């Protein structure tokens, strides 16, 4: 940390840090609070910012006011991103919970997203096990276990074979 930055008020340093963090990607409010509270890595090792709780609250409020921090936008983008990577609704809900997003906000966003989880589960299964999907019980169990690990619901997994039989 240079001498000029160490003279800046803690609020200004926190605000600068928050904007830099949020410029990279969206974060939940809890993630941003955790990152702001972490020590800054300087040339001489970790350096603490002598900021008060009020400074942190002002920075968070400023980020909300100016549109840098929006949990609903974060949730929508997170769901879209993780579903594109092949994860199911149960896994996405768990990850959002770990990121400090309320259950209500998560459920609202999951209802609003337009994702066909059954089709996504089928795509993941065919990507991993090939087309056509096996009909032997032991192979079905492997696919089921894989999809459950990826976060798909049992009803979506069972629909794969129901739709396959049609």
UniProtKB/Swiss-Prot annotation:
Question: What does the entry list under GO cellular component?
Answer: cytoplasm
Q: Keyword check for Ribosomal protein, yes or no.
A: no
Subcellular localization(s) per the UniProt record: Cytoplasm
Q: Which domain of life is it from?
A: Bacteria
Report keywords, A-Z: Cytoplasm
Q: Does Cytoplasm appear among the keywords? A: yes
Per its UniProt record, what Gene3D superfamilies does this chain match?
A: Winged helix-like DNA-binding domain superfamily/Winged helix DNA-binding domain
The GO annotation for biological process reads: regulation of DNA repair
Supply the InterPro entries for this chain.
RecX_HTH_1st (IPR053926), RecX_HTH_2nd (IPR053924), RecX_HTH_3rd (IPR053925), Regulatory_RecX (IPR003783), WH-like_DNA-bd_sf (IPR036388)
* Biological role stated in the UniProt entry: Modulates RecA activity.
Of which family is this protein a member? Belongs to the RecX family.
**What is the protein name stated in its UniProt record?**
Regulatory protein RecX
Organism of provenance: Escherichia fergusonii (strain ATCC 35469 / DSM 13698 / CCUG 18766 / IAM 14443 / JCM 21226 / LMG 7866 / NBRC 102419 / NCTC 12128 / CDC 0568-73)
């Amino acid at each position: 940390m240079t001498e000029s930055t160490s003279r800046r008020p803690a609020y200004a340093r926190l605000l600068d840090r928050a904007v830099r963090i949020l410029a990279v990607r969206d974060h939940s409010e809890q993630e941003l609070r955790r990152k702001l509270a972490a020590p800054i890595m300087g040339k001489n090792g970790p350096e603490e910012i002598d900021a008060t709780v009020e400074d942190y609250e002002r920075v968070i409020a400023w980020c909300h006011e100016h549109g840098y921090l929006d949990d609903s936008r974060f949730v929508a983008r997170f769901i879209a991103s993780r579903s594109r990577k092949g994860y199911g609704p149960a896994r996405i809900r768990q990850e959002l919970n770990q990121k400090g997003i309320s259950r209500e906000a998560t459920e609202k966003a999951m209802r609003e997203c337009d994702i066909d989880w059954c089709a996504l589960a089928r795509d993941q299964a065919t990507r991993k096990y090939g087309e056509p999907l096996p009909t032997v019980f032991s192979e079905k169990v492997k696919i089921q276990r894989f999809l459950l690990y990826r976060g798909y619901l049992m009803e979506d997994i069972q629909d794969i074979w129901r739709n396959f039989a049609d």
